[in-house]
Amino acid sequence: MAGELFIGLMSGTSLDGVDGVLADFADGRIAVRAYATAPFPAALRAELMALNTPGDNELHRAALAGNGLARLYAGVASQLLADSSTPASQVAALGAHGQTVRHRPTEFDGVGYTLQINNPSLLAELTGIDVVADFRSRDLAAGGQGAPLVPAFHRALFARAGQPVAVLNIGGISNLSLLPAADAPGEPAVLGFDCGPGNALMDHWSQLHTGQPFDRGGRWAASGQVLPGLLARLQADPYFAKAPPKSTGRDLFNPAWLSACLAPAIGAAPADVQATLTEFTASVCAADVLRYGSDSKLLIVCGGGALNDHLIERLRAHLPGVEVAASTAHGLPPLQVEAAAFAWLARSTLRREAGNLASVTGARGGRVLGAIYPA
């Protein structure tokens, strides 16, 4: 392609803000020219959080939230262009994920649905850049889960010769990519799926009891003691016994779900609950690495959870013999990986290349993902 500059914008289930990258794919390799981030305005964050569960006047509220998110996205895109001295006319496309508020693949009628709030038409108008959005619906239409979509990008970025690699993205929800060695004979399939909660429950508990949006470095969790009974109840959810392909979200793992698990532990010290939630995330992620990726001796961690030192320590404790390392040493800093993935997916859309992996999502085959909204 003549133009190999793409913007990727991602706001994940953590609802902590928008991450954006300006990525250069010249020669088929990725180089990040600029990175920018913006926190959610409090009112928009609260509305997006509320839209995760059924409520009154949802269509009206979702439409206005989409407008607000498009404006926030446009601000991040503008910052990327300013920081890199790049005119909008040089950017081939902007991949904008949107904000997932419902994810119910294959349910109800065999197809189900996934809903990412966004207004890509407004985003194209505000930025003057072609926008690619709605990445997940095409995979659902082909019988897939629509998630996770990052394993294809993880393969492009992290796969290496002679060594299988596991990649753990810890956002609000955690997902795992298991990458065969790049030179493995027979081109074995990539495996990927959502492990379960990542930061979502920890962040909720931190906000509720400390007023902080997250537990910085996991220090609060490290001050508490794990509650074995609560941990067992958290781990007993049927989701964890399901075999891949599988995906999940705040539809399941939300404050109401946590409250039900906490009911027998009324009176527990908040720090002990935080310690237990951190152990919960570490234990379910590590269990999936051991169950499905036991040949991987390198676990690359990205997403906001990679910055939680206590969580990383607990992962290492559960995975003796596995090198657990942040993605920085292997190509991109943790907070840039998902945004870069959606720049890569936008590029794949323009090139009419499949962006999903059927071995990951369970779709009937590879599909070109996303819808294009011309500037």
Swiss-Prot record:
Catalytic activity: 1,6-anhydro-N-acetyl-beta-muramate + ATP + H2O = N-acetyl-D-muramate 6-phosphate + ADP + H(+)
Pathway in which the depicted protein is active: Amino-sugar metabolism; 1,6-anhydro-N-acetylmuramate degradation; Cell wall biogenesis; peptidoglycan recycling
KW Transferase (keyword) present: yes
Residue positions binding ATP: 12-19
Record-linked Gene3D superfamilies: 3.30.420.40
Pfam families the UniProt entry points to: AnmK
An annotated Gene Ontology molecular function: ATP binding
GO BP term (any one): amino sugar metabolic process
Keyword ATP-binding: yes
Keywords: ATP-binding, Carbohydrate metabolism, Kinase, Nucleotide-binding, Transferase
UniProt-listed SUPFAM superfamilies: Actin-like ATPase domain
EC number(s) recorded for this UniProt protein: 2.7.1.170
Family: Belongs to the anhydro-N-acetylmuramic acid kinase family.
PANTHER family referenced in this protein's UniProt entry, alphabetically: ANHYDRO-N-ACETYLMURAMIC ACID KINASE
Protein's job: Catalyzes the specific phosphorylation of 1,6-anhydro-N-acetylmuramic acid (anhMurNAc) with the simultaneous cleavage of the 1,6-anhydro ring, generating MurNAc-6-P. Is required for the utilization of anhMurNAc either imported from the medium or derived from its own cell wall murein, and thus plays a role in cell wall recycling.
HAMAP family named among the record's database cross-references: AnhMurNAc_kinase
Stated name of the protein: Anhydro-N-acetylmuramic acid kinase
